[in-house]
Amino acid sequence: MIIDEMTNNVFLKKLYSGDITSSILIGRFSIDLSGYCDIDFHVNKKPDISVEKYGVWGVDYNTVVIKTKGKISGDVLITEWLLNSYKELNVKKTDNGIIIKSKNGKFNFSVELSGLIFQGISVYYDGEG
């Protein structure tokens, strides 16, 4: 599970005690020349707990954005980024960290990281549902 591979994940484990990788959108990926990256994971699964400042699920928001920071430790592969959509996220633990992969038709995303740090949450209502 992706949350288990993040440091600083205490709040996230309360928000989502179960697996969230079956339907995640990689909403943002950026990388700098030093190899640090930001990845935003959009989750359209209702959280296990209510957080008052976010409002009511399904009324005020229906998507949770998990903001993370990582350090690239190997390959980065992105093809057909604009075809990205909600899809299963595969997370594989390695000796050097983790590999995160998502594939949907021609869209393909794969990144090798030495680690992933939870940075924060934002929420929004996508107009669907």
List PLM regions with ranges.
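Surface-exposed, interaction-prone regions used to assemble/regulate multi-protein complexes
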Residues: 1-129
